Amino acid sequence: YAVMLPLKRIPEYRFQVTRGSMKEAFFDAYEYPCQITEEEERAFCAGVYYKAYKKLGAHPVVCGGVRGTYFAVWAPNAIRVSIVGDFDRWDGRRLPMHRMPMSGIFELFVPGVKAGASYQYEIKIKGGAVQRKSDPYGNGVQEAPSVISVVAELGEFSWQDEEWMKEREKFVSREVPVSVYETDITEWKKHGELAAFLKETGYTHVEFHPVMEYLDQNSGGYST
């Protein structure tokens, strides 16, 4: 569908889709500019863009006064990459992404997508095969065994460890006694304060089994 309007400036607008008696209005994802600068793209191509994690993946942001999520993934050999999720009925035709010419990064800002939304990338490769892939830079994933990515808001937690981080810089392990206590943190959910126990028994450090989710819950995370 296409329409040409006799206007010099692009006005604020919405699309409205009618399916029988159902009407759905939404923003146009393609009216928003790319959030990755040319300088950042050149640094990425040179292998020196050390903050790629701030742009690649899925990041809830405000763009042009509209809240949504910015998606970006590197897929240089793909013919097409689309975002599919519960916000577009998992239909790869609805949100094909922009391809950045130098790097092969595909990117798109999708208005209205919030933290908690499930998504994947639908990738069309040479030969016409279509695959769905999880986000390699994703910050959330559904509970195993699902591998579907989840949009996550990372800015909500306020760290309070500035003084401790400064003190840590002065620590030289080879000059002081070290006694390490290894444990699974889930064991301490039922047994009170771990820190109090460590101080009482004289341990200086603690080594946790993996605290992030791992695939085989019976493995204790040793293969993580």
Describe each model-derived feature in a short phrase.
Residues 10, 74-81, 90, 113-114:
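Short proline/glycine-enriched turn/loop motifs at strand-loop junctions of beta-rich domains
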